[in-house]
Amino acid sequence: MKRAFIFACLTGLRFSDIQKLKWSEMQQSTELGHYIRFVQQKTKGSETLPISDEAYNLLGEKGKPTDPVFPDLIYSDSRNADLYRWMIKAGIEKHITFHCARHTYATLQLTLGTDIFTVSKLLGHRHLKTTQIYANVIDEKKTVAANKINIGL
């Protein structure tokens, strides 16, 4: 679960897409580096998602093409409890679900300067409006940051 959650933070993939991910969908080319070619569970859209070397290396030893990349990944209350305990150990008190990894990816991409159109495509969103939700989070952070500096005038 931990490895899959970190992979989601590094790729923005939904739980359902990570759960069904097969080794045959993991690709590499000189042009794109590591990438995943898959059909999204939610939208049924065909996607090509570039991933970082760090995300790829997290996967460990490559299995057979038909093998799942995360063979023991199931959605259950006990798995969510595992995730909760892991967060508590890390000092994170906020309620975290697996979907938070996707939010983390989007927010980090925007915070690090990736334009919203690219983030939208990386997430496989059909409409830019969907991605705008994450941009609003960044706008709130900018407002908070701007108000941190106060020289007492």
Feature locations, PLM:
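Exposed loop/turn and edge beta-strand positions of beta-sandwich/beta-sheet ligand-binding modules
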Residues: 1, 32, 45, 64, ...
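Basic, Lys/Arg- and aromatic-enriched nucleic-acid-binding interface segment
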Residues: 1-15, 19, 32-33, 65
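Short basic/aromatic active-site micro-motif
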Residues: 1-2, 76-77, 93-113
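C-terminal catalytic core of tyrosine-transesterase DNA break-rejoin enzymes
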Residues: 6, 10, 16-17, 102-126, ...
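Conserved tyrosine-mediated DNA breakage-rejoining catalytic core shared by Y-recombinases
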Residues: 11, 20-58
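Catalytic-site neighborhood detector that most strongly recognizes the C-terminal catalytic loop/helix
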Residues: 40-44, 123-148
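C-terminal catalytic core of Y-nucleophile DNA break-rejoin enzymes
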Residues: 40-85
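C-terminal secondary-structure termini that scaffold catalytic or DNA-interacting sites
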Residues: 150-153
